[in-house]
């Protein structure tokens, strides 16, 4: 059994985050009957480390809770997160590409109408391409 300080040291997760995970229903350590302190068993430490990995993968807390409540959903949760990250990557690639199209050096020369029009055109083209892929 570990106290919260030891759990923090073993996992690299702050006490505040460990308490937050408890509050969100992701973790339920036993309480010492004599002093009321939390006592973390090896399976609690493992759970904290599992949560740590899923949070590093940017999996939302509610989906982590679903995975804990229904372990058989884990594969679906990971697949859903992968798809979400792939969409974000595509969006970021579009934004980076658009940044490279901006040719002005001076903010005063930056024409918002021109670039908003280009953005709208790109968005329409992307929607059309996605529509033709769905057909």
Regions picked out by a protein language model, each given a short descriptive name:
Residues 128-135:
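Hydrophobic protein-protein interaction segments
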């Amino acid at each position: 059994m570990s106290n919260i300080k030891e759990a923090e040291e073993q996992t690299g997760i702050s006490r505040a985050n460990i308490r937050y995970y408890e509050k969100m229903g992701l973790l339920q350590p036993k309480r010492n009957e004599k002093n009321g302190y939390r006592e973390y068993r090896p399976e609690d430490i493992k759970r904290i480390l599992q949560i740590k990995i899923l949070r590093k993968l940017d999996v939302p807390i509610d989906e982590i809770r679903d995975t804990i409540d229904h372990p058989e959903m884990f594969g679906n949760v990971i697949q859903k997160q992968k798809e979400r990250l792939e969409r974000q990557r595509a969006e970021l690639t579009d934004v980076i590409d658009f940044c490279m199209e901006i040719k002005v050096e001076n903010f005063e020369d930056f024409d918002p109408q021109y670039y908003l029009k280009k953005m709208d055109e790109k968005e329409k083209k992307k929607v059309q391409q996605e529509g033709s892929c769905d057909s």
